[in-house]
Amino acid sequence: MKFNQILPVIAIYVVALGGCSNTTPDYSEFYKDPETVKEEDPSLNDNQIKVMSFNIRYYNTNDTGDKSWETRTTAFIPMIEDQKPTVIGIQEARPPQLKWLEENWKDYGYIGKGRRANNANNDEFVPIFYRKKAVELVKWDCFWLSETPDVPGSQGWDNTVPRVATWAIFKHIASGKKFFFINTHIDVGSTIAPGKSMEVIVNKMSELNPEGLPMLLTA
């Protein structure tokens, strides 16, 4: 992302699940585009950032074969080393998965809270991972996608579960510029909640970003 008035974003959308007809597939290549598509140069200028949105699929013992967490993680380290995103919005992360990411994405820190009020170990997070050498964390917190967004664990409208959003203000070290970032996971099993959730997010953008910093949203 260049820090201009109108901000084009270098975005990478990664699908965690995948397959291959090869009898011995190289799962570490899951994330790559087909060979017919020219890959982008992962390097960045001093006034750019790279943003990734990544639904890692919550840990589920019923997932087997190439859908299993253990198989899918073989692509996670080479993908990050190859693409070097500045910030990553993660969806569907359970605490054991967060622990794995923290231990293996060593150049990154992360922020986030569980979607329920008690931060239970089987709870889901929508954390933000950030490259520590590229950005400085200025401040962060969470709010909930409900009629009472400042109440931890609150569940609004026809959401099937509580939905949380993680927000942060970062300072880009190379340029000295700050930007505002939100990561969340909109409920797809409801009718009213998606639109109402976006209303909450838009209101929170104004409330939490009074400086009018460049804004980014992953979901």
Tell me the role of every PLM-derived stretch.
Residues 1-8:
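Bacterial N-terminal signal peptides that target proteins for export
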Residues 29-43, 87-182:
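Structured beta-strand-rich core segments of catalytic domains in phosphoester-bond hydrolases
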Residues 48-61, 138-143, 177-187:
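Active-site-proximal beta-strand elements of phosphoester/diester hydrolases
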Residues 62-66, 85-87, 154-155, 185-191:
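Second-shell loop/turn segments in exported
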